[in-house]
Amino acid sequence: EYPQLGGDYEVIHHTQLLQHLVDEGKLVPVTPVEGIITYHDPCYLGRHNKIYTPPREIIGKVPGLRNEEMHRHKERGFCCGAGGARMWMEERIGKRINNERVDEALSLNPDIVSTACPFCLVMLTDSVNGKKNDGVAKESIQVVDVAQLLLDSVRTPLDPAGETETETAPEPEPVK
C-alpha cells in the first residue's frame, strides 16, 4: 500500500543490512565471541522470503564462533512456535513447539542459540529458561539475535583500566 501513498521503498531485513555493512568494511567484527552457536531460521525470513545466507555470513565473520546447524534448518527449518498466535496459547496435549525446537538445539550442546526474529527470540528464550530451571540446559547458554552477536564483536575490548579504547560520545541534551 505504500506505493499508493507515494512511497516507493526497498524493504530489507536487518541481517541483510548488517551483512552489507560488514562486507563494505563499515562494521568490522574484531572482538571474539567464543563458543558453539546454532542458528534458528525464522519462518518468514527463511521459508517465506528465502533469506538464509545473511545471518550465517554474519555469524561466520564473528571471530571465535563455531556454527553447528540443527538437523532441521534452512528450507527444512522448524517453527519456533510463535506463528499463528500460538505464542499466547498453552498446549493442552503434547509438547510445546518451542520446547521441541530448543531440544533440537540443545542436542548440539551450544553456548549460544541465535535467531533473527523478535518472536523467535521470545519463544526460544522462554524454552531455554524453562530448561535451565529444570536443570536440563547449562546456565551459561544464551539466546541472542544475530545483531547482538555482531554488536558484541564490533565493540572494542576493555583496556586494563576498564575503559573502552574508543572515545565515548557526549550525552544528548534532554528534550525541552
Q: Where in this protein do the model-derived segments appear?
A:
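Iron-sulfur cluster-binding electron-transfer modules in prokaryotic oxidoreductases
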Residues: E1-K176
